Swiss-Prot record:
Lineage, broadest ranks: Bacteria, Bacillati, Bacillota, Bacilli, Lactobacillales
Name of the protein: Translation initiation factor IF-2
Bias (Low complexity) ranges: 254-266, 313-332
Gene name linked to the record: infB
Keyword tags: Cytoplasm, GTP-binding, Initiation factor, Nucleotide-binding, Protein biosynthesis
Cellular component GO terms, alphabetical: cytosol
């Protein structure tokens, strides 16, 4: 036989599992929990032993009726009221009653009017068809059995009496319909067969009632837990109240003891005899306690700390009802104003001010206010204001004081005052001059920084090309270096950093900048050219920077090379060879063929070893900007030379007047690196703007400090630029007036790197054309954009692009606005073009040229024409478009133009030498015989 678990039996019967377990234990079965198994016979015993009413209505078998042919048992049609009256009283537990009440649902409202109309219509139809009573009974019996089948699902959704009534209502409706004969006999037979099958099935489980029972059980458990939790919270609140009361009493005792001790120290007069105040005090305290609203509990009982619960007065319930009706935040405990409630609030204790000792030292800053000083020395501002008034200084607590006043005030208090040295966070130069910034114990040897200088086309880039084994020289426009480059090579296990500077005269500032950051200068002089102007300039820069010079005499492979002449010329400028007793090393090389290059590198390392070059790689990096430019995809790109410390990716950095974070870092070979030590040239991205070449940079501790320093430096630079106003004085008054009369060529300069921008602007400003000057409206790094064209159109300027190109939008806008764009890659061409433009803007200058002379031989006066002078040309020629002067006795009488010129009777353009003719002069008729006519023209002078 199969076994059943107890919870399965409970589900079938429709009761809780614990009831089945208890019943099984009463019957003597060995079970422990609802998961225990029993035999089928024991399961039937448990089911049959349950009390009536425990199982659901669906599990009860229907009473059997006497079978009749073609008829089944018919349940009588009953009403809800009759069922409620005739139903036997069942013994149910409290939980089951609660479950039934929870599961009870309100039946849906019926449309009685529609039912009456349907019944009347069906009755009329039945009478018309002549249906008999037997047919009606059969239909009713079939429908009574079918209604249970058709409404089985509907009955299962209900619970308890409500579902039973609902099924009865539906059954009565179906009965009314089938009573009219609307269901066929075959449908009735099917209904009877289904009902018979359902009656033979086992007991059903009412899931709705079961769910309601579980819900009721959960609600009961939650109510018990809530009650327990509420009581625990109430007990905790009472404990806290007791502790607070105890602490208050202890504090009161301490206060009384302190007052008593203070009274004992002072001799007090004899107190008058007074009545004991203990009883009235207790009475007052009791009165106050009565006025306080008692603690509330959830069951509307008054809770006393030392006694049982008491029933609450109806007064509080009425107040709660009024409060709920008002729906307001009414608070009964709110203190009412008035003399009757003055005793409810305890008097505030008087706080005694703590005495603070004066500090021994006081560090002040210029401009501190009285309030700030009072806060620092723990004194009232009024006290300090009083002291200042006694010293003769009228001040308020928000007034700033100077350093002398603060020191006098501190002397009066007996405090030693010292002025605080303020550190300018925006000052980058302090890192370069502060000796304490570097750790002397962490100093290590660093690579030398070598700057290659010399005249243009003397072979500087070719030497670097040979050293780096690359074709840098062929990539330069016009064969000259346009901007500075930094490279690093390795020789004998040691690194050397090279800086390449341009040799053209326009790049003076770049050469000076290179000399300021270098350790050794390699001066290249061509053996066939000798010392040139830029060679002398490089010598002066190196001497000004105090940098040792190594002379590399290049192009010794040429037939006309003369190294001895170069050595002698350099000696005249203070560069003396060690062979001649000087301190400069000379090396004869051929950069083109790589001759003596190793000797040059060894000489550089030897001089570097003598110089003892060291750096501290442990500090935050500082250094100098070698070059800066704007890249279309990367933004601002700066080439930096790290001089001290180590530069890392993501370091917050301040460069010149801008700031940023090192986003990416590449070395001279274009490879990405994460760190760069001393003497390493790197290219970084991540700056907000392109800095100026030659600016110093420093790494800060965090991005916030770097941002503050960068913004402050930019602000100061802007203020400094605005302060550079030219004031008119007696000394420069003439120059100012002359400048107002001069013509101006406005230019906008855009270049690829910052060094080229500076060099180009300086070169254009040096162009000397009398009467014309160059005005650089704007200069920047990057491509020519629309804003440049707009500015050029507004200022009537020419846009010069050096190694850059305009964007398509800028080019289209320039064509529309008729703005001229000049693109160049060689600085010579730019200077020549601007110089020609400046000369073309001058007003033309004319020079007087005498072309002929004539003598008046006869005069003729003609009406409406004037005086006609007959002349003979004595020198040169007289032309029709020439001007004429009338000279009489060596004095110019009139200067004007010829009105007509004739040879005999014909109008001619000119009359040659020794020929005769006639002429008239505009607006002059006083021509006399022997007057000399001098003919001249004005010729333009070429500049």
């Amino acid at each position: 036989m199969s076994k059943k678990r107890l919870y399965e039996i409970a589900k079938e019967v429709g009761v809780e599992s614990k009831v089945i377990v208890a019943k099984a234990q009463e019957l003597g079965l060995s079970v422990k929990s609802h998961s225990s198994s029993v035999e089928e016979a024991d399961a039937n015993r448990i089911t049959s032993s349950l009390k009536p009413g425990t199982a659901k209505d669906e599990s009860k078998p229907a009473p059997k009726a006497t079978p009749t042919p073609k008829e089944e048992k018919v349940e009588p049609k009953v009403d809800k009221a009759s069922v409620a009256k005739s139903a036997p009283a069942k013994e149910t537990s409290k939980a089951e009653v609660k479950e039934a009440s929870v599961a009870l649902k309100k039946p849906k409202s019926r449309n009685f009017k529609a039912e009456r109309e349907a019944r009347a219509k069906a009755e009329a139809e039945r009478r018309k068809n002549g249906g008999g009573r037997d047919n009606r009974n059969r239909n009713q019996q079939g429908n009574d059995q079918g209604k249970r089948h058709n409404n089985d699902r509907r009955n299962q959704k209900g619970n308890g009496q409500g579902d039973h009534n609902k099924g009865n209502r539906d059954n009565s409706t179906n009965h009314d319909r089938n009573f009219q004969g609307k269901l066929r006999n075959d449908q009735n037979q099917n209904n009877r067969r289904d009902n018979a099958r359902n009656n033979q099935a086992g007991p059903r489980i009412d899931l709705k009632a079961r769910a309601a029972a579980l819900k009721a059980e959960q609600n009961a458990e939650y109510s018990r837990q809530s009650e327990t939790r509420f009581r625990e919270e109430k007990a905790a609140e009472q404990r806290r109240a007791k502790e607070q009361e105890k602490a208050r009493k202890e504090k009161q005792q301490v206060k009384v003891a302190v007052q008593k001790a203070a009274a004992e120290t002072k001799p007090a007069p004899k107190p008058a005899p007074v009545a004991p105040q203990s009883a009235p005090t207790a009475q007052v305290q009791d009165t106050r306690r009565k006025k306080v609203r008692p603690n509330k509990s959830r069951d509307n009982r008054r809770v006393n700390e030392d006694g049982p619960k008491q029933t609450r007065n109806n007064k509080w319930n009425n107040q709660n009802q009024v409060r709920n009706q008002r729906n307001s935040n009414w608070n009964k405990n709110k203190n009412k104003k008035g003399k009757n409630n003055r005793g409810n609030s305890a008097p505030k204790p008087v706080t005694e001010r703590k005495f603070h000792e004066l500090p021994k030292e006081f560090e002040y800053t210029e401009g501190m206010t009285v309030a700030e000083i009072a806060k620092r020395i723990k004194r009232e501002p009024a006290e300090i204001v009083k002291k200042l008034f006694m010293m003769g200084v009228m001040a308020t607590q928000n007034q700033s004081l100077d350093g002398d006043t603060i020191e006098l005030l501190m002397v009066d208090y007996g405090i030693e005052a010292t002025k605080k040295e303020e550190v300018d966070n925006a000052d980058i130069e302090r890192f370069f001059v502060d000796e304490d910034y570097l750790n002397k114990d962490a100093m290590v040897e660093r690579a030398p920084v070598v700057t290659i200088m010399g005249h243009v086309d003397h072979g500087k880039t070719t030497l670097l090309d040979t050293l780096r084994n690359s074709r840098v020289a062929t990539g330069e426009a016009g064969g000259i270096t346009q901007h500075i480059g930094a490279y690093q090579i390795e020789e004998g296990g040691k690194k050397i950093t090279f800086l390449d500077t341009p040799g053209h005269a326009a790049f003076t500032s770049m050469r000076a900048r290179g000399a300021s950051v270098t350790d050794i200068t390699v001066l290249i002089v061509a053996a066939d050219d000798g010392v040139m102007p830029q060679t002398i300039e490089a010598i002066n820069h190196s001497k000004a920077a105090g940098v040792p010079i190594i002379v590399a005499i290049n192009k010794i492979d040429k037939p006309d090379a003369n190294p001895e002449r170069v050595i002698g010329e350099l000696a005249e400028h203070g560069v003396i060879s060690t062979a001649w007793g000087g301190d400069s090393e000379f090396v004869e090389i051929s950069a083109k063929f790589g001759q003596n290059i190793e000797e040059l590198l060894e000489t550089i390392l030897l001089v570097a070893e003598v110089e003892e070059l060291k750096a501290d790689p442990t500090v935050r990096a500082i250094g100098t900007v070698i070059e800066a430019r704007l890249d279309k995809g990367k933004g601002a790109v700066a080439t930096l030379l790290v001089q001290q410390g180590t530069l890392n990716v993501q370091d917050p950095i301040v460069v010149g007047n801008t700031f940023g974070r090192v986003r990416a870092m590449t070395n001279d070979l274009g490879r990405r690196i994460k760190t760069a030590g001393p003497s390493a040239p790197v290219s970084i991205t991540g700056l907000n703007e392109a800095p100026m070449a030659g600016d110093h940079f420093a790494v800060y501790e965090d991005e916030k400090a770097a941002r503050a320093a960068g913004e402050e430096r930019a602000k100061r630079a802007l203020m400094k630029q605005r302060q550079q106003t030219h004031r008119v004085s007696l000394d420069n008054l003439f120059d100012t007036l002359k400048a107002g009369e001069m013509k101006t060529v406005n230019v906008i300069i855009k270049a690829d790197v910052q060094g080229s921008v500076e060099a180009l602007a300086a070169s254009l400003l040096k162009i000397d054309v009398e009467g014309v000057r160059v005005n650089v409206v704007h200069s920047a790094v990057g491509a020519i954009n629309e804003s440049d064209i707009t500015l050029a159109e507004a200022s009537d300027a020419v846009v010069i692009g050096f190694n850059v190109r305009p964007t398509p939008q800028a080019r289209q806008q320039a064509e529309t606005d008729e703005v001229e764009i000049r693109l160049h890659s060689i600085i010579y061409k730019v200077i020549e073009e601007i110089e020609d433009a400046m000369k073309g803007m001058l007003d033309p200058e004319f020079e007087e040229k005498i072309i002929g002379e004539a003598v008046i031989r006869e005069t003729f006066k003609v009406s409406k024409v004037g005086t006609i002078g007959g002349f003979m040309v004595t020198n040169g020629k007289i032309t029709r478009d020439s001007s004429a002067r009338v000279i009489r006795d060596g004095v110019v009488i009139f200067d004007g133009k010829l009105a007509s010129l004739k040879h005999y009777k014909d109008d001619v353009k000119e009359v040659g030498n020794a020929q005769e003719g006639g002429l008239t002069i505009e607006n002059y008729n006083d021509i006399k015989v022997d007057d000399v006519i001098e003919a001249y023209i004005m010729e333009e002078i070429k500049r």
